[in-house]
């Protein structure tokens, strides 16, 4: 997923993104887009019920029309929500509002592994291992739970500002 963290924030009219400013599920006020991938975009959002900032992953328009794909998205969201690991983003909620299929997740301030590699390359082996150990631990936990990530790449690995 490509990071948009440094993109300018704005309104739907200013950015051309109709989701910005929208209220999903009468609960999530969508803010700035922070990442975009082939199947979905991720936005910073406010959970109005719990008064907290979350990440909302929204499938691109039309992706939810494929019933098999949408069903897999929901199954994987439910499975991911049961996964509790310090190096796995927590899934809080899942929904579908008028064809807008979404996940509400923990917002992890930080950068992608791709960003870290670009900034720190070449890096000592000890640093590379320190970055990869939590990733491998998270993947092992997911696999024990019967989950397969399907898209492990540096752009999809978050390195939190707090180091996790």
Predicted feature descriptions by range:
Residues 46-53:
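Conserved N-lobe loop of protein kinases adjacent to the ATP-binding glycine-rich P-loop
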Residues 131-132:
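Activation segment signature within eukaryotic-like protein kinase domains
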Residues 60-82:
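AlphaC helix of the eukaryotic protein kinase fold
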Residues 94:
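Activation-segment/catalytic-loop signature of the eukaryotic protein kinase fold
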Residues 35, 75, 84-87, 100:
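Flexible N-lobe loop architecture of eukaryotic-like protein kinase catalytic domains
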Residues 135-147:
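Protein kinase catalytic-loop region centered on the HRD/HxD motif
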Residues 98-112, 116:
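Conserved short submotifs of the Hanks-type protein kinase catalytic core
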Residues 30-37, 42:
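Protein kinase glycine-rich loop
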């Amino acid at each position: 997923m490509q990071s948009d963290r440094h993109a300018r924030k704005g309104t739907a009219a200013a950015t051309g993104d109709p989701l910005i400013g929208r209220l999903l599920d009468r609960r999530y006020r969508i803010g700035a887009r922070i990442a975009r991938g082939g199947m979905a975009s991720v936005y910073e959002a406010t959970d109005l019920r719990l008064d907290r900032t979350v990440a909302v992953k929204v499938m691109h328009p039309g992706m939810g029309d494929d019933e098999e794909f949408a069903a897999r998205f929901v199954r994987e969201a439910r499975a991911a929500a049961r996964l509790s690991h310090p190096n796995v983003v927590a899934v809080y909620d899942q929904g579908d509002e008028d064809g807008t299929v979404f996940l509400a997740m923990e917002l992890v301030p930080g950068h992608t592994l791709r960003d870290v590699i670009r900034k720190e390359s070449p890096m000592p082996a000890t640093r590379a291992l320190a970055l990869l150990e939590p990733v491998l631990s998270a993947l092992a936990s997911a696999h024990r739970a019967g989950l397969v990530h399907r898209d492990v790449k540096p752009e999809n690995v978050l390195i939190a500002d707090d180091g996790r």
